[in-house]
């Protein structure tokens, strides 16, 4: 690979309009902005494969059912346990005092499993989101609120598209077997992943002529 075409190289040697190189802190942030979504989507893809194994759809999915299955995967499985924020100004909420500069945590996983918001929250229901109208702070696997005015992840829609393509690929484009492995996952690890990751065997592409071994 020509290292001149790598993102890291371009960030390091990028110059502002005045000809100055970026500060090293800015370069580090931009590199992390690339790495974070790559790692995040890899985690989601692993859990999509696990969801298809643990709760396989009974038949071909409509577009709405496909989206719902991906949303339920994001709700049900642990992605990132919390987000962090610092209080800007003193305020009181439901009897709790929040002082300025206090570091606070928002429980993402707990919110996505809250029994007052979700029926049977600890059960994976692939069709849960079909015709569902969720409030902006009840379904928050990647933050809550509005993308434009809050802290909801701006790349959430792209993540959903990637996961829908993944489900379609695993269900319709290939066939495979999962050998015996440890598919359990921890609620205390960051990020959480199936213990054995997802190991596949006998992977074959579906073609018009039948099944061909994957290369």
Q: What is each of the regions a protein language model found here?
A:
Residues 17-33, 127-148:
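Short, hydrophobic/aliphatic alpha-helical segments
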Residues 1-42:
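Conserved cytochrome P450 catalytic core segment spanning the I/J/K helices
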Residues 107-134:
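Conserved cytochrome P450 K-helix/beta-meander segment immediately N-terminal to the heme-binding cysteine loop
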Residues 117, 130-195:
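Cytochrome P450 heme-thiolate "Cys pocket" and heme-binding signature region
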Residues 28-32, 39-63, 154-174:
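Cytochrome P450 catalytic-core helices
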Residues 61-96, 105:
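Conserved cytochrome P450 K-helix E-x-x-R motif and the immediately C-terminal K′/meander segment
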Residues 186-215:
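Charge-rich, low-complexity terminal tails
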């Amino acid at each position: 690979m020509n290292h001149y075409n790598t993102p890291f190289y371009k960030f390091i040697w990028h110059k502002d309009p005045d000809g100055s190189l970026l500060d090293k802190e800015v370069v580090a942030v931009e590199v992390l902005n690339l790495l974070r979504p790559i790692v995040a989507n890899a985690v989601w893809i692993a859990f999509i494969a696990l969801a298809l194994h643990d709760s396989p759809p009974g038949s071909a999915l409509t577009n709405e059912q496909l989206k719902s299955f991906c949303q339920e995967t994001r709700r049900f499985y642990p992605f990132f346990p919390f987000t962090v924020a610092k209080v800007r100004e003193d305020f009181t909420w439901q009897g709790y005092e929040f002082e300025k500069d206090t570091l606070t945590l928002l429980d993402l996983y707990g919110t996505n499993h809250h029994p007052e918001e979700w029926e049977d929250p600890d059960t994976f229901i692939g069709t849960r989101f079909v015709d569902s109208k969720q409030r902006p702070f009840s379904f928050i696997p990647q933050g809550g609120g509005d993308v434009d005015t809050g802290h909801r992840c701006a790349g959430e829609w792209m993540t959903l598209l990637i996961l829908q393509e993944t489900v379609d690929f695993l269900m319709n484009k290939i066939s495979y077997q999962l050998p015996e492995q440890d598919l359990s996952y921890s609620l205390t690890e960051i990020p959480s992943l199936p213990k054995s990751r997802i190991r596949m065997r006998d992977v074959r592409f579906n073609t018009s002529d039948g099944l061909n071994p994957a290369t």
